[in-house]
């Protein structure tokens, strides 16, 4: 039976199991899932993973999954960005369906296997080191220089040759100040009913701190007690997309030390980047289901609009 009326469910990711990186077991599951995808194709309009998969099958000698070599599936895995759109909006065979298809987490397993074999490119290692890039690029003297060179055509051509970053790709600009440096003492009068700790995220700390400016102003206007979380690290989503799960764990352990005290004290933790919220709300609880601090932070974190809607529903949101 296709699909169902039940809510999609997700299972924890047993990534520390010795069989998780077993390629023979992985390939068997990969081909099982791809065979169902091949027969359905409802997801073809989503990310490039699916057209890539279907083209590989259609151009094979058998016109079936068995006509595609295991190595050719690397392209399909690389094109998945773990956005979950297929899982949440298209696939009729996700759990609790008997076929139990979780395409994004299967791709994550493939990425983890690739990373374990040291196949991650230098470019990807650099681009996913967002804390390092942010600290370097947001220095007052360096930021305008980097922004200037990123607009020069010859420099972008060189960058394309060295790091394979497309010359026409729009790169984020660095700010000459960080959100954390501006709001070292942001906390205002305590409001026991409404108190928020802002997780600035890498992007809005180093690239667009003006978003944090606006967020702080809106919250203060609504008499919300505001604090900025200090000394945090990247949420780990970029490293998750590489399959670098051990680094994800290290980042999580560091951040939990900063986050859990706010969650225990009744703060809502707000992050302005949806993928960062998703990381703490969904991915980390599935990767570390036994960690009580992860579950605690997962319940406390939300995006700004979810929090403002809470105020609106309580009749305390100022609309002026």
Predicted regions and their residues:
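Soluble N-terminal domains of membrane-associated systems
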Residues: 1-2, 33
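Non-heme iron-sulfur electron-transfer modules
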Residues: 2-20, 45-81, 93-123
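Short alpha-helical segments and helix-capping/turn motifs at coil-helix boundaries
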Residues: 30-33, 91, 182-185
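Iron-sulfur cluster-binding electron-transfer modules in prokaryotic oxidoreductases
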Residues: 101-320
């Amino acid at each position: 039976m296709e699909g169902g009326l039940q809510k999609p469910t997700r299972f924890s990711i047993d990534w520390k199991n010795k069989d998780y990186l077993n390629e023979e077991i992985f390939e068997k599951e990969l081909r099982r899932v791809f065979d169902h995808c091949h027969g359905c194709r409802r997801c073809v309009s989503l990310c490039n993973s699916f057209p890539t998969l279907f083209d590989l099958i259609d151009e094979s000698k058998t016109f079936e999954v068995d006509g595609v070599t295991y190595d050719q599936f690397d392209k399909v895995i690389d094109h998945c960005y773990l956005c979950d759109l297929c899982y949440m909006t298209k696939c009729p065979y996700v759990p609790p369906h008997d076929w139990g298809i979780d395409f994004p987490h299967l791709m994550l397993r493939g990425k983890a296997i690739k990373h374990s074999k040291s196949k991650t490119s230098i470019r990807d290692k650099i681009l996913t080191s967002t804390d390092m890039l942010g600290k370097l690029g947001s220095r007052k003297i360096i930021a305008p220089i980097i922004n200037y060179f990123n607009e020069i055509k010859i420099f972008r051509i060189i960058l394309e040759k060295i790091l394979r970053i497309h010359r026409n790709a729009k790169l984020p600009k660095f700010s000459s100040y960080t959100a954390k440096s501006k709001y070292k003492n942001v906390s205002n009068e305590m409001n026991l009913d409404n108190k928020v700790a802002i997780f600035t995220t890498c992007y809005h700390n180093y690239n667009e701190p003006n978003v944090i400016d606006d967020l702080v102003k809106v919250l203060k206007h609504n008499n919300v007690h505001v604090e900025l979380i200090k000394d945090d690290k990247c949420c780990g989503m970029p490293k998750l997309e590489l399959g670098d799960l051990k680094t994800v764990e290290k980042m999580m352990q560091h951040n939990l030390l900063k986050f859990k005290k706010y969650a225990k004290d009744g703060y809502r933790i707000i992050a302005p980047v949806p993928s960062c919220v998703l990381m703490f709300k969904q991915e980390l609880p599935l990767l570390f289901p036994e960690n009580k601090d992860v579950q605690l932070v997962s319940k406390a974190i939300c995006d700004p609009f979810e929090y403002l809607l809470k105020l609106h529903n309580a009749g305390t949101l100022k609309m002026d």
